[in-house]
Amino acid sequence: MIRKMTQANITDYNKSCDGFTIIGRIVPRYEDGIWSYTEEIFKEHYNKQYELDDIDDSYIEDEDKAVYFYYEEDRCIGQIRLNTNWNGFGLIEEIYVAKGSRNKGIGTALLNQAEEWAKQNQLIGLMLETQDVNLLACRFYAKHSFVIGAVDTMLYSKFPSAHEKAVFWYHKF
């Protein structure tokens, strides 16, 4: 069951954030105005966890923002954080599904909720940013009709993850 974040359930924020497994990366290519990519599978897989963001009340009060939780019984096992971007797209700031609950349609349900929210807000589509090394996420977005719109090789320059590329995915309605 999907529920919008309220003051009553705000403490469930980040409960489903278990990190993710890196099994490889996409290798993007831009040619004749079209993005494509191949996959490179790593010999050794590893787990990755980013520092988690705090949440503020504006995601409850501001109509241009929203957080939705996915519950199994009373346990929060997924979340998606949305914002209205300056370019008319709904920005998926983050989407998480707890490790033990992945590959069960929860991510798809959260994306469907995001699309419904974006359409209610008269946005032209959804967008998000992920890393080239988050191959499993890239596969998920491609499966759900997202396409690469840009790749940024400098975005993470300041961080230990400087070797990663930021991949911007778009789904126009």
Indicate where each model-derived feature is located:
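Conserved GNAT acetyl-CoA-binding A-motif
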Residues: 118-131
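Acetyl-CoA-dependent GNAT
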Residues: 7-8, 15-89, 93, 98-99, ...
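Short aromatic/hydrophobic contact patches that present stacked aromatics
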Residues: 96, 127-129, 170
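Conserved acetyl-CoA-binding loop-helix of GNAT-fold acetyltransferases
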Residues: 97, 103-120, 139-143
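Extreme N-terminal starter segment of soluble prokaryotic enzymes
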Residues: 1-2
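C-terminal "cap" of GNAT-fold acetyltransferases
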Residues: 131-138, 144-147, 154-173
